[in-house]
Amino acid sequence: MDLTQIQNPSFLKDMSISELEGLSEDIRKFLIEELSQTGGHIAPNLGVVELTIALHKLFDSPQDKFLWDVGHQSYVHKILTGRAKEFGTLRQYQGLCGFPKRCESEHDVWETGHSSTSLSAAMGMALARDLKKTKEYVIPIIGDGALTGGMALEALNHIGHEKTDMIVILNDNEMSIAPNVGALHNVLGRLRTAGKYHWVKDELEYILKKIPAVGGKVAATAEKIKDSLKYLLVSGVFFEELGFTYLGPVDGHDYEKLFETLQYAKKTKGPVLVHVITKKGKGYKPAESDVIGTWHGTGPYKIESGDFVKPKEVAPAWSAVVSETVLKLARADERIVAITPAMPVGSKLEKFQKEFPNRMIDVGIAEQHATTMAAGMATQGMKPFLAIYSTFLQRAYDQVVHDICRQNLNVFIGIDRSGLVGADGETHQGVFDISFLRHLPNMVLMMPKDENEGQHLVYTAMQYEDGPIALRYARGNGLGVHMDEELKAIPIGTWETLKEGTQAAILTFGTTIPMAMEAAERLEKAGVSVKVVNARFIKPMDEAYLHDLLGKNIPILTIEEACLIGGFGTGVVEFASENGYHSALVERMGIPDRFIEHGSVTKLLEEIGLTTDAVVDRIHTMIPSKQKRA
């Protein structure tokens, strides 16, 4: 079937099961071929082909509402709703988004990117439906990994209490990104092995009611028997205790079983949870056999071999530099513990996990818990290293404020994927952390200019015992610089001069330092002398350096790959104003006041005007012509 000719899912209504099975094969082949060129979340989507087709066949989108939790498993949904022809642009600038996007299609009713939001949003939609007295189905699809998020559990509790009509699809593939952890995962494991409970209890009730005269009374009395049967067949039926009708487990790749179960769910009043078992990566051997999450989301790859197409790496990944330095220090200090909220692979903590399994803690998708747990460990003299993506640190903000900073606890936060991350787009760009951390009392915030300075700042963080300290580091690789053998502590709040200059100064840090250096060199050739400063401590700033620099009364340009509002540049302007300097001398470059879409980092920087050319042009406008050297 030519998938690019699909305009909407209505064609599924008349298809037989054998035809649907053929369509499943076509979709898997299409995904494997297309994603080999663009990259993307291949394994989650290969696992939900039949489930997505079944949902679109039995329900009527967009009248019926599908909410894809996290959203990375929505590719099949996009194909069935007329977007197959756009897959060549997947996750590229102004191309097809890798997550549901309301402006893309009326079938995308809820935008996602972070996990565990679908149930709360679905409850909102269901309550709105009931208030408006309409009849559509509301169907959140949530994975077993996302179900460990506290927000999802809060929503389950509320939905069950209110007895709201809703069909929750639990897509259980036993993995989120990496293998799942936690007690809830173990509950689901027991449910998988006790899948006959729902059908047995219904058959029992049906048979008892057929007994003449006394059947109804016996059936009523049998409720107690049925409850006992429930605990006999399923050890701890978590969802029914919350008020849901539990259906399953059902094979998520068997159309007959899916149709039977979903039709039953449509007829059932109140909240229903359909437990669907799927195989992540189904239909592509390398992805299907992956047990650690390598094929969850990938770049381009070779279909035949399963080898990833990567440029030759001349420098280590930032995540590896940080995690391996922490590991090196942990060998000499038993107090060091690594913590991750379900991202051991992305944060490059596999080596730490292998060497110190008892000191590497993966809490699952539970950022709030991870953060306060780290705080608790710090009260007992441990040295917790919390490795967390910038975008996911947002989910634990109150814990950083209330539990870490307020108590001034020695927690080292590794803020991975800081700055623009590219293809995952606006839900994942790490551009807000400076603004929401800079104003917190007791917080120290750093970002290195290269991987060598990065390892020294990790060492600095582990030696620091005066409160919380955070290190920002980017996605991707470092610069390939020489790495010192011996680690050293860098004095807190100190900057360094990278290039001397007399007519203007650039203050920057991290990934924008090469841009600043190149701009300064070009300006030098044009007769403009520009100082470049490595402002590696975003907080506290080097106040002595700033006093000296502002006292020279020369233009100052701050550059940051982070949002301008409340950012580093704002801090420099505030310092100038509060200390009697001419704050108009300071201009800022950074991320504007909007969400940044998906695309390559290079393209996005160009689009927002954060390039070497833009820096050169800005400096020229800041320096009066008469001050420029001939």
From Swiss-Prot:
What does it catalyze? D-glyceraldehyde 3-phosphate + pyruvate + H(+) = 1-deoxy-D-xylulose 5-phosphate + CO2
Q: Write out the pathway annotation from the protein's UniProt entry.
A: Metabolic intermediate biosynthesis; 1-deoxy-D-xylulose 5-phosphate biosynthesis; 1-deoxy-D-xylulose 5-phosphate from D-glyceraldehyde 3-phosphate and pyruvate: step 1/1
- Which top-rank group of organisms is this from? Bacteria
Q: Which EC number(s) does UniProt give?
A: 2.2.1.7
Enzyme class, top EC level, equals: transferase
Q: Which residues bind thiamine diphosphate?
A: 72, 113-115, 145-146, 173, 284, 367
Which InterPro entries does the entry link to? Dxylulose-5-P_synthase, THDP-binding, Transketo_C/PFOR_II, Transketolase-like_Pyr-bd, Transketolase_BS, Transketolase_C, Transketolase_CS
- Could you say which cofactors this protein requires? Mg(2+); thiamine diphosphate
Q: In this entry, which stretches build a coiled coil?
A: none
Q: Where does Mg(2+) bind?
A: 144, 173
The subunit field of the Swiss-Prot or TrEMBL record says: Homodimer.
Report the function annotation for this chain: Catalyzes the acyloin condensation reaction between C atoms 2 and 3 of pyruvate and glyceraldehyde 3-phosphate to yield 1-deoxy-D-xylulose-5-phosphate (DXP).
Name-wise, this protein is: 1-deoxy-D-xylulose-5-phosphate synthase
The species this protein was found in:
Bacillus cereus (strain G9842)
Q: Which gene encodes it?
A: dxs
